[in-house]
Curated annotation (Swiss-Prot):
Keywords: Cell membrane, Membrane, Sugar transport, Symport, Transmembrane, Transmembrane helix, Transport. Belongs to the major facilitator superfamily. Sugar transporter (TC 2.A.1.1) family. This is Sugar transport protein 11. The lineage of its organism: Eukaryota, Viridiplantae, Streptophyta, Embryophyta, Tracheophyta. It comes from Arabidopsis thaliana (Mouse-ear cress). GO terms for cellular component: plasma membrane; pollen tube.
Amino acid sequence: MAGGAFIDESGHGGDYEGRVTAFVMITCIVAAMGGLLFGYDIGISGGVISMEDFLTKFFPDVLRQMQNKRGRETEYCKYDNELLTLFTSSLYLAALFASFLASTITRLFGRKVSMVIGSLAFLSGALLNGLAINLEMLIIGRLFLGVGVGFANQSVPLYLSEMAPAKIRGALNIGFQLAITIGILAANIVNYVTPKLQNGIGWRLSLGLAGVPAVMMLVGCFFLPDTPNSILERGNKEKAKEMLQKIRGTMEVEHEFNELCNACEAAKKVKHPWTNIMQARYRPQLTFCTFIPFFQQLTGINVIMFYAPVLFKTIGFGNDASLISAVITGLVNVLSTIVSIYSVDKFGRRALFLQGGFQMIVTQIAVGSMIGWKFGFNGEGNLSGVDADIILALICLYVAGFAWSWGPLGWLVPSEICPLEIRSAGQSLNVSVNMFFTFFIGQFFLTMLCHMKFGLFYFFAGMVLIMTIFIYFLLPETKGVPIEEMGKVWKEHRYWGKYSNNDDGDDVDDDAYF
């Protein structure tokens, strides 16, 4: 594969002692529950904004506008309302800014402290939303939820990457994405049940139940140790070595511990990680911590996850059918993520990126063509039962392609490629870019659908093609490489090597590769 610098596992990961212990498995499973926070919020919003009780309470003008338009708008534009989409997407702006603060706290006080803060903030937001009596209370609750998501998404992937042995780091890190998909599925099921409840109980229950994953994570945090990397970063060598011995299940950890110490010494020399990550020698990390989350959102996946009920209604599904279809796609998302857990450390990151990208391109084009055939440019048309089943099957194939590629790898790769001295900054950059474009897609998707019509699916297919080419030429394989030896991967890559071997941070010729 062009541009792929493959590293033999025996040359890196095989010389560390230890085994996969029950202790490290349990701690990683508990930590991964942080993904439930993000997943539940992604899945719940679309159902809540479709409840008339909720709209009557907080957005009566929007409800009247929608009722007055019935029968006069095209299928593509029937749900286009910026105020409603702002309710969904505003959380992610709060998460964006919180991720920068989380970077500093994670570095100074440890990954565990950031997870506790994230849990408390998310729990506070869930309580405020579930008990909201006015729009101000609702928005403040959304901001607290955003802070919780920002802290959890910044700290949990780092925690998992640092705790896991190199040979199964991918599988354990994907536990975070699996928890996200379980959260989405749980929200889809809640959305199916709660609209049947009267007197405003439905939307309150939907929003308030976000507190359940927050409590689970908060309780779990009290039983989690901090990572050896983080303990060492804060100056306690003896405790760090003891923790490394515990999670590796052996006293023979000298080689790995020495690598951690070397990385820590390098990190101590870095006083301003946000300045350092801009240096030439960190150009690969800067590139992937920026472009992977950017591309992840432009796969179009959150179109399905945010607005699944609305999207299915838009393309002709009935109310119950749209909610059931959202549950089905959520289940496919979970099962396909489980597939990635078993395949990521066997086939590698690049193989999953490329296969998943191809699958998403084909299915997006097929969905766009099907909708264009049935509704045309004017949005007038309808779907037969067979047509609806075909579109649902295509969307499920698309979700599966994402769930074993860009979904988990979008969190795994940025969290494992950065050296300790810029790791918190790199992960914070990853989260902030992800949150910004999550906000962008959430805010403007319904408007884009109204104006671009079925061509929107072609747009996302084109973006997936671009990102697949990007991965093919520029991403080296990181399977089985110990996290503190990741620098060797970049030095051996035919493009990134000129940056990673440039210890002085001088500018280099970008055209040399071409």
